Structure formats: structure tokens, C-alpha cells
């Protein structure tokens, strides 16, 4: 029972952590929508500024999720946010190299050729950063390495862990992405009514436990594509 309670508490904590980047979306949506509307009373430069500001938030949601997950599991310690950023960019770089090895066409994410893992990659990178922080933030090293002891060691070990994660994801992710694409096609084209019913039923079941944010994440940020206000397919 204790292990079940721990798992339940961890999943709840994950759900709460995901709400931090989600809270930014309304502002990002307003900026993007108003900027793309090209109102006659709004100078073109201001519209462009608002549109780009909103678009850059949506374009970097995975990084925001990585930071939020790391903070959520480390009592909001800022070092974990740095570690999460390191974890995510190293993950992208590793998967970019492996994409060439496996013959996968890379996409550019934050200027880095990589595989497109979306917010899942960010969540995993943040989770790795949180685990490394909680494991090593009190580590002691020999005197001549004392500068790197304690919390300063966390981003270093996180980078190494992110390389390992990237190697594993490079093998696992392509078939997973294929399954997600197949599911999104089924949900949007083959039987959207059944898909909506299934989603709503499970989501309502999880609300009393505070776990619905976990269920929502793949539907909100991974499944399917859409065209935003600027005409960009996401």
C-alpha cells in the first residue's frame, strides 16, 4: 500500500507541475491571436511583436514543461531549472545525432536538428533533472574538485543522464510517434465521436483524483496537428 500511495502522490505532483506552463498559454494565445489579426488601429510592428512573442512561447512548450516538472519535484529549487534546461538541450542534440545514424529525417527544435518528441521529451528531460537533483544535490567531492560539489554537480550529472535518455529515446520514439500519428488520424477522421467520448469519460474519472492533467497532456500537445493564427502547421 505504501508503494501505491507513493506512486499516486508522485502522479499528483506531476499533474500540479504541468499546470505551471499551462498557465502561460492564455497570455500566449492572446498575444498570438491579436498579433495575427492585423487590426488597422494597431501598428504593424506592434502586431508582429505580439505575434512573435506568442509564437515563441508555443514553439518552446517542451522546454517550459521540462523546467516545470523539475521544479515540481524539487521544491522549486532554481538549480533544477538549470539542470532541466541542460537536460533538454542535450537530449535534443543526442537524438539529432542518432537520427542520422538511424536514417530518420531530423527536424529543427530550438535551432537543434533532432527528433520531434514534443512535450513528452520535455517532461522526460525534466524528470531526469529532478531525479538527478534529488540524488546528488548534497554530494561531496575531493577537495580539489570541491568547486563542483553539491548543487553545482547536478547539471553535470544531468547532462550525462540526458545522453543516456537520448540514446534510449532514439530507438523507442520513432515507433511511438508512428502510433501517435495513427491514433490522431483515427481520432480525427475514422471515429471522432468515439474518440471524444473515450477522452471525456477517462478525463472525468480522473478529475476527483487530480490526475486529469496527466491524461490531458498528450491530447492537448501531441495528438494531431493544427494551423495556428499565423498559418503555421503545428
What are these regions (language model features)?
Residues 92-102, 156-157, 190-198:
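Juxtamembrane membrane-interface segments at transmembrane alpha-helix termini
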Residues 91-99, 161-174:
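Hydrophobic alpha-helical segments and their helix-loop junctions in multi-pass secondary transporters
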Residues 59, 118, 122, 154-155, ...:
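Residue-level signature of transmembrane alpha-helical entry/exit and packing/kink sites
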Residues 7-149:
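Early transmembrane hairpin of solute transport permeases
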Residues 151-161:
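Small-residue-rich segments of transmembrane alpha-helices in multi-pass membrane proteins
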Residues 1-5:
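Transmembrane alpha-helical segments of polytopic membrane transport and secretion proteins
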Residues 173-233:
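Aromatic-rich transmembrane-lumenal/periplasmic boundary elements in polytopic membrane proteins
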Amino acid at each position: 500500500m505504501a508503494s501505491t500511495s507513493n506512486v499516486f502522490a508522485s502522479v499528483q505532483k506531476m499533474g500540479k507541475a504541468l499546470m505551471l506552463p499551462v498557465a502561460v498559454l492564455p497570455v500566449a494565445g492572446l498575444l498570438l491571436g491579436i498579433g495575427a489579426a492585423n487590426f488597422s488601429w494597431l501598428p504593424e510592428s506592434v502586431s508582429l511583436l505580439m505575434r512573435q512573442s506568442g509564437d515563441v512561447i508555443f514553439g518552446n512548450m517542451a522546454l517550459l514543461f521540462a523546467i516545470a516538472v523539475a521544479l515540481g519535484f524539487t521544491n522549486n529549487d532554481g538549480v533544477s531549472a538549470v539542470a532541466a534546461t541542460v537536460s533538454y538541450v542535450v537530449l535534443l542534440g543526442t537524438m539529432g545525432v542518432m537520427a542520422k545514424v538511424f536514417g530518420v529525417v531530423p527536424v529543427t527544435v530550438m535551432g537543434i536538428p533532432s527528433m520531434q518528441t514534443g512535450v513528452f521529451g520535455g517532461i522526460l528531460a525534466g524528470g531526469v533533472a529532478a531525479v538527478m537533483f534529488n540524488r546528488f544535490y548534497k554530494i561531496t567531492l575531493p577537495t580539489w574538485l570541491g568547486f563542483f560539489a553539491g548543487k553545482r554537480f547536478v547539471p553535470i550529472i544531468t547532462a550525462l543522464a540526458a545522453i543516456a535518455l537520448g540514446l534510449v529515446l532514439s530507438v523507442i520514439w520513432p515507433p511511438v510517434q508512428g502510433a501517435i500519428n495513427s491514433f490522431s488520424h483515427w481520432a480525427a477522421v475514422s471515429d471522432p465521436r468515439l474518440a471524444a467520448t473515450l477522452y471525456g469519460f477517462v478525463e472525468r474519472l480522473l478529475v476527483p483524483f487530480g490526475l486529469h492533467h496527466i491524461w490531458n497532456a498528450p491530447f492537448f500537445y501531441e495528438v494531431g496537428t493544427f494551423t495556428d493564427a499565423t498559418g503555421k502547421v503545428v
